[in-house]
């Protein structure tokens, strides 16, 4: 009799600690912050990512896109990411230099790539993967490189 009570008590405790999968779970919310307008290539890509994440996960993941520095200003975003206040960014690569990964500053040099094909050979190959891995010790996981246009110079002559 005592053993039966003990078994029943343990079973009840185990059941109480087990989450019920039949109960609707809240979606995972990812805050995606960037500093450009909605209608720019980066802004449109962020919106598309949010849409596809919702579709592919059947609503289990919801991506909230905060454009135009509405959530954090340009200089605040990286710190917010490291603190977990946002989960995704689409920063310019120059933002990783102050984080201690100076190799990313290479991409700010003018005329380093002649065209997008050369750029993609670097960013989508072993060099790009190596650069993204350098972010991990800083508490940041680099997922991919997004094109942000080439630097241009102009002058009054």
Language model features with spans:
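Contiguous mixed-secondary-structure segments that line small-molecule binding/active-site clefts
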Residues: 50-51, 79-82, 87-88, 92-157
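Immediate post-signal peptide segment of exported/extracytoplasmic ligand-binding proteins
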Residues: 20-33, 54-62, 136
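Bacterial N-terminal signal peptides
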Residues: 9-18
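Short helix-initiation/N-cap motifs at beta->coil->alpha
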Residues: 65-79, 148
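Extracytoplasmic "Venus flytrap"
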Residues: 31-48, 68-73
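Short, polar/charged alpha-helical segment
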Residues: 39-64, 126
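N-terminal glycine-rich cofactor-binding segment that shapes the pocket for flavin-like pterin cofactors
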Residues: 28, 62, 69, 73, ...
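Bacterial N-terminal signal peptides that target proteins for export
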Residues: 1-10
């Amino acid at each position: 009799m005592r053993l039966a009570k003990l078994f029943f008590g343990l079973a009840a405790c185990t059941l109480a600690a087990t989450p019920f999968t039949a109960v609707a779970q809240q979606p995972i919310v990812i805050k995606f912050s960037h500093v450009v307008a909605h209608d720019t290539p980066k802004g449109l890509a962020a919106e598309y990512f949010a849409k596809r994440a919702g579709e592919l996960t059947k609503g289990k993941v919801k991506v909230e896109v905060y454009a135009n520095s509405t959530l954090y200003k340009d200089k605040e975003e990286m710190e917010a990411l490291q603190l977990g206040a946002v989960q995704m960014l689409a920063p310019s690569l120059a933002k990783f230099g102050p984080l201690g990964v100076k190799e990313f500053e290479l991409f700010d040099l003018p005329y380093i790539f002649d065209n997008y094909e050369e750029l993609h050979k670097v960013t989508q190959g072993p060099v790009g993967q190596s650069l993204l891995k350098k972010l991990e010790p800083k508490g940041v996981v680099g997922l991919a490189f997004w094109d942000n246009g080439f630097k241009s110079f102009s002058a009054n002559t």
